[in-house]
Amino acid sequence: MALSVNDCARLTGQSVPTMEHFLPLRNIWNRVRDFPRASTTAAGITWMSRYIYGYHRLMLEDLAPGAPATLRWPLYRQPPPHFLVGYQYLVRTCNDYVFDSRAYSRLRYTELSQPGHQTVNWSVMANCTYTINTGAYHRFVDMDDFQSTLTQVQQAILAERVVADLALLQPMRGFGVTRMGGRGRHLRPNSAAAVAIDARDAGQEEGEEEVPVERLMQDYYKDLRRCQNEAWGMADRLRIQQAGPKDMVLLSTIRRLKTAYFNYIISSTSARNNPDRHPLPPATVLSLPCDCDWLDAFLERFSDPVDADSLRSLGGGVPTQQLLRCIVSAVSLPHGSPPPTHNRDMTGGVFQLRPRENGRAVTETMRRRRGEMIERFVDRLPVRRRRRRVPPPPPPPEEEEEGEALMEEEIEEEEAPVAFEREVRDTVAELIRLLEEELTVSARNSQFFNFAVDFYEAMERLEALGDINESTLRRWVMYFFVAEHTATTLNYLFQRLRNYAVFARHVELNLAQVVMRARDAEGGVVYSRVWNEGGLNAFSQLMARISNDLAATVERAGRGDLQEEEIEQFMAEIAYQDNSGDVQEILRQAAVNDTEIDSVELSFRFKLTGPVVFTQRRQIQEINRRVVAFASNLRAQHQLLPARGADVPLPPLPAGPEPPLPPGARPRHRF
């Protein structure tokens, strides 16, 4: 794919005038003789990159003509003969995140030669790591006298987690700047970029860097001892912090709808279980189908933020098993299904159902008006819609309505409560789907934030088996915390490396890998897990696998080593794949006592391949030819090459044929 000057400037960190001076060229098929042989082959560029130019560092500098990084050997006031398009953007992406360490290895070059086409690509493996402190779990929930308060501890954890999942979020706003100590000095001290940072930060304390609020928040959330129960909901808070004004309205509305639905089904469940204990005042009962635009009244009645104290107080009214089903049903919207109900009596419910309205059943009336009502609701939001509203289909003829009413009567009388609750959820789900379609591309990333459903379903299964204990709760909390961090980081990498169209158009994601190492208080590795995925959707596929894997492993907590007959079933539960690391490490993870784990190290590795562009500027080609000839002669005489930036006069071009190829280089192709 052709590379424009603007694309090259964006992905190399250089200015547009610099790239216009450089004159980038991707396909050198009919231009090979304009360059020295070492500059056109993969082996030759590898030699130049490693021993002459040091491309792995040089690409991070300001390489404008006459810039400080270009003054002496080997550039002589000109840009280099090549640019690795996307490499500087990759390094900048990793530096802009809260990783503790970053490494870039295996910088290699490959060439593709065929009639009419000769190009060179670069590839690199990035490895970015940070550690989260999980050893402070005992401070998260009071574990004193745990066995006698098991139910209270479980309900406290659930309440805090549900409040985080359904809280009505607003982004943090403030004035001035946020500063983070000990960050931001990832560039070489003498580089032009570092000099610019130092000039900007004059008067600022040593080692501090001005950072966005969301980056400061995430650095804070890395330590469970420090953030305590604020860790719950970290991923969603960071997501809405980065959203634009339109996305903020849509995401907040989606969260309100989930909250309202959760409060609705909890109220209905509690009322069914205790019809005389929770009478509802008449003013709060909605009359259907007269309230045909019932969504606004529904939100007004039920979208109050979920309160942890009120959830804990539900212990007598709503069994934990039913509470978990309600949580899963609400959090999984717009997917999933309504919670199963065993009582079809709607007495004490939150809606006043009128069996017939003009000869038609309530649920059927709601279903027929659903699309038009949803469109009106979205149109009333203070956002500009991305899609033109399709007008609703005309109502069916009256003859059909009369005939259908007779057929519906018996079914509706039999299934009214169940069908009605299903219709409420279907309406909310369809509205959420429509709102998600209105999100901008950068905010439409729910595939990274659905992990909560896996963990709630795991606790639901444990509750059904009567297997809730300290070990399962400890692992549930710890892995939920790990999943929050994993989701946030993978979403960040997805947004910067796959969802940024300019980068994704030219740079290919070959492999993505997440390595999770649990360490004890002395730093020893307790177990290590590896997940690999390839292809364009590698980041989202990794999140789905990790979420399912960690949630399934929660159910094995406290059971010790797996028996032979259990291993195959466990591997099926975590959807084991051959590229998921050593099986013994997986079994060790399932059997370990989580009290031994003090911290979890998360490593995110990904391999990228991008294009190399060549210069068409004769002056740069000439300097490169003279530099390569001089370096080749020094190497032939077994002498050391000058250090980059050394004050070496530009050598003259020797007379005669070109110097011999460096080791490993191949002769020029002729077709």
Swiss-Prot record:
Site (Priming of strand displacement replication by covalently linking the first nucleotide of the new DNA chain): 580
Positions carrying O-(5'-phospho-DNA)-serine: 580
Presence of keyword Transferase: no
One Pfam family from the record: Adeno_terminal
Keyword terms, alphabetized: Covalent protein-DNA linkage, DNA replication, DNA-binding, Host nucleus, Phosphoprotein, Viral DNA replication
Region (Disordered): 386-409, 645-671
InterPro entries on file: Adeno_preterminal
Compositionally skewed regions (Acidic residues) per UniProt: 397-409
Protein name, entry field: Preterminal protein
This protein's encoding gene: PTP
